[in-house]
Amino acid sequence: MEYRKLTKEEVAHLEQVGCAAEDWDRVMVHPNINIKYLRNVRFSGDCRIGKFEKAFTMPGGIHKHSGIYHATLHDTTVGDDCCIENIKNYIANYDIEHDTFIDNVDIILVDGPTSFGNGVEVSVLNETGGREVTIHNRLTAQEAYMQAMYRHRPVLTERLKGFAAEIVQQYTAERGRICHNSTIVDTGYIKNIYVGPCSEIEGAGKLKNGSLMSREDSPVHIGYGVIAEDFIVQDGSHIEDCTTITRVYVGQSCNLGHGYSASDSLFFCNCQEENGEACAIFAGPFTVTHHKSTLLIAGMFSFMNAGSGSNQSNHMYKLGPIHQGVMERGAKTASDSYILWPARIGAFSLVMGRHTANSDTSALPFSYLIEKNGETWLAPAVNLRSVGTIRDAQKWPKRDKRCREGRLDLVNFNLLSPYTIDKMMRGVEVLNQLRELSGATSDTYAYQSAKIKHSSLERGIELYRTAIIKFLGNSLISRLEKSRDLKPKHNDGEGDWLDLSGLIAPHSVVRQMMNDIEAGTIATHHEMDTRLREIHSNYYEYEWEWAYQLMLRFYKLREDQLTNDVLIRIIEDWKRAVVGLDKMLYNDARKEFSLSTKTGFGFDGNIRTAEADFEQVRGQFENNPFVTAVQNHIEVKTALGDKWIKELS
């Protein structure tokens, strides 16, 4: 855009209305500027000012015309139709794009060169260091997982640091940018901050060395009292209500609020953190905590809900806060739970009470960990029949608030996948071994510093087998709907599987990608990201390759024995498994409508009043949306199974 110098008449008028400049020749303006919208402005350095033709409509119906009033600008460019007023100190070294509104701010400056939060090292999991993740504007949960968890591959670690360094260099500058249609009001200190398009900063206390990666279709909001230093906030996220973050990465569509405090932590897409505290955590997608008394520390989580008063310890008062823990995807904690790290909690498990025995229950997913008389008791697989587990699995895709385009984190929502089914296979093996070693008549069994009741062990084996059969039937029918040729053309999906903080993939495929990164075959961050997205998009091909081999092993078949009669038997097993699990869920949901749950209803009446009050508030069991969904699921899956049995007969 071409700018012009101010005329002598314009300079004289500006000086009459309180404007001043170190050198008016260094103040360039839009050819069509109306200088009546400049009042009490001090210029220094090289400044460029756009035109003022539009007005902003504020809440309450008041209109403010674009212009610059009561401000000091140094080496700053202001785009068209901006309104900047009441800057107590100054704005320095910024390019402010069109249609931006800035009012009642203390100071906005860049003291460069700066990378706007890019390149900050976050000490996740181990407070004393050793698993640092370099944050940058394109960071994904999967890249961060590899940075943090693969320190046993130092060449890979160095390559990943190199990829990050390239991006950091791209974003390093001596000038800041406030992109178009942004709003900054009632804010204190802003230093070395990149402000993306349509950002909203209202009442923030202090923002230093960070990036707001806002987008037009997915704006960022920073609210009152927020203090943030050395950070990156991705699009769609809201940081509100006196939240304090230091050395923190906030992924897409996250909410941090109600005085939340976090340091040296990573929060990936759709996390919700309120009231509590986080230190050195790796919060994968959908990590949620809402309670003041909850501390998450030195742990890795994903698809997790922390109950009130949930705490962990990473310090044994010997060599410092050096311990860490993992709660695999879907694991959650009940109120007042406590875990002494190190520990590893199996996927989709529920932790209740205090646990100090450093257990590893990763081979027994979907379990309850219960404290009884100071000991950890394990109930394997019981979460498979919990209505809460299925409700969680259904709500996560619905609560993904990210825009369809430009999603960074790769998220697989499947509850039953090769990752969890392989763990169930190992779980059956573990439980059978315990039964053989201790005897089938033992009352209790010891595993990983935990105790398992005989009845819990037997029930766990049965539930795991039922879930495995359900998964195999799901995969078989999905394959039949695509092709009658069941034999996979490749074997990439065979072997064990990993969960890279949301991305579920075969270990062999991930390992090959890492080998290619180390060898330089994958030479840039973009190439790595492309490979990860290819792996994610090929999930169902990989899944069938794995499920096909498991089906042969589970049913003790050779490939030439996969006749239609055998497939019919597998589908019949699947029907029984689906209906059986759904009936368990149905019965579990019924407990929420028992007489005891009606306690406290019908305050001033009798039992009939309580029942009527309960129905008005909670509804009837038969009409509950989840209950009707379970009933419909039974009908739909039964019909689907019957259809394929008929076609194969």
What are these regions (language model features)?
Residues 1-2:
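Basic/polar N-terminal segments that are highly enriched at the extreme N-terminus
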Residues 5-6, 12-21, 29-68, 72, ...:
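Glycine-rich hexapeptide-repeat left-handed beta-helix
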Residues 73, 173-223, 228, 444-457:
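Well-ordered, non-transmembrane segments within structured domains
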Residues 89-90, 94-101, 106-116, 120-123, ...:
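Long, charge-dense tracts
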Residues 105, 372-649:
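Long, compositionally biased intrinsically disordered regions
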